[in-house]
UniProtKB/Swiss-Prot annotation:
Gene Ontology process terms (BP): angiogenesis; articular cartilage development; bone development; collagen fibril organization; negative regulation of angiogenesis
Glycan attachment sites: N312
Family membership noted in the UniProt record: Belongs to the small leucine-rich proteoglycan (SLRP) family. SLRP class III subfamily.
Disulfide bond sites: C289-C322
Residues of the LRRNT domain: 116-153
Primary location: secreted
Originating organism: Homo sapiens
GO molecular-function term, one example from the UniProt record: extracellular matrix structural constituent
Protein name: Opticin
Gene field: OPTC
Residues the record lists as Sulfotyrosine modifications: Y65, Y71, Y139
Any Pfam family: LRR_8
GO cellular component terms, semicolon-separated: extracellular matrix; extracellular region
Record's compositionally biased regions (Basic and acidic residues): 29-39
């Protein structure tokens, strides 16, 4: 009898400790995953939930993400030691701070951006001191930039979100043939020289939402992901057949602009075209489907958004036969 009582007490105690320790373990596990203060995680592109298509997360340079977690602890040290030789450092090279093993990318905090940028115009600008350069990625978010800074030749990923850049010049990306992604979300860009992106043959993702663009420049044909949401794009600002040669284009996000027509012809590679909240009133019957070819030629294009436009989609019943799904929008 006493043994039985002891056993049930033991069971109770075990149950208690078991449940009590569970949340603690869970909490600890979460804490370990959380960035610590000073880790500079705010520069990472991983929180861009709003504009993520299915694969946007997959193409993020995860190797760099790991590097960043590795070097978090060294941040304060590097910051202090690497600021001194600012004037002599060429921005085209990856700089290595004294005391940091040479294989490490330089980590600096972008806190001195305003100072350095205003005192050192144009060449000689130590981009990797005001921005964070990690491998082939350059992070320049939210440091009051007014221009694209000179970039290291090997730059493949550029993030310069939340700045005050108003213009992109033809020479800004000249010779940066390794660039795969340019993210200039949330700037004041109202003009882009026509040649600014044209020769960037490696460019896959061009991300320009929340700017003031009325027109698009010539785009390189390798682009897979084009995001120009929340600008002032007009149909006259998009060249006729601007997207036709872009045979890798999968995501075309042009919502919340001033377009009054659907820009066509659209490449067959498209999976997603967002045109909601524009001024589209009508459409060409062949903008999606080729009336000559009675086939389901657009199996990929599953996501067409035309809601928030004055168009009555019921008026174009013959425009959708090749699509796997009807567009989203007003049908009555
Ligand atoms: C939209 O078009 C359909 C088909 O012609 C028509 O029946 C409907 O009344 C139209 N709706 C509006 C709001 O104009």
């Amino acid at each position: 009898m006493r043994l039985l009582a002891f056993l049930s007490l033991l069971a109770l105690v075990l149950q208690e400790t078991g449940t009590a320790s569970l949340p603690r373990k869970e909490r600890k596990r979460r804490e370990e995953q959380m960035p610590r203060e000073g880790d500079s995680f705010e520069v990472l592109p991983l929180r861009n939930d709003v504009l993520n298509p299915d694969n946007y997360g997959e193409v993020i340079d995860l190797s760099n993400y790991e590097e960043l977690t590795d070097y978090g602890d060294q941040l304060p040290e590097v910051k202090v030691t690497s600021l001194a030789p600012a004037t002599s450092i060429s921005p085209a090279k990856s700089t290595t701070a004294p005391g940091t093993p040479s294989s490490n990318p330089t980590m600096t905090r972008p806190t001195t951006a305003g100072l350095l940028l205003s005192s050192q115009p144009n060449h000689g600008l130590p981009t990797c001191l005001v921005c964070v350069c990690l491998g082939s990625s350059v992070y320049c978010d939210d440091i009051d930039l007014e221009d694209i800074p000179p970039l290291p030749r090997r730059t493949a990923y550029l993030y310069a979100r939340f700045n005050r850049i108003s213009r992109i010049r033809a020479e800004d990306f000249k010779g940066l043939t390794k660039l795969k992604r340019i993210d200039l979300s949330n700037n004041l860009i109202s003009s882009i020289d026509n040649d600014a992106f044209r020769l960037l043959h490696a460019l896959q993702d061009l991300i320009l939402p929340e700017n003031q663009l009325e027109a698009l420049p010539v785009l390189p044909s390798g682009i897979e992901f084009l995001d120009v949401r929340l600008n002032r794009l007009q149909s006259s600002g998009i060249q006729p057949a601007a997207f036709r040669a872009m045979e890798k284009l999968q995501f075309l996000y042009l919502s919340d602009n001033l377009l009054d027509s659907i820009p066509g012809p659209l490449p067959l590679s498209l999976r997603s075209v967002h045109l909601q909240n524009n001024l589209i009133e009508t459409m060409q019957r062949d903008v999606f489907c080729d009336p000559e070819e009675h086939k389901h030629t657009r199996r990929q294009l599953e996501d067409i958004r035309l809601d928030g436009n004055p168009i009555n989609l019921s008026l174009f019943p013959s425009a959708y036969f090749c699509l796997p799904r009807l567009p989203i929008g007003r049908f009555t």
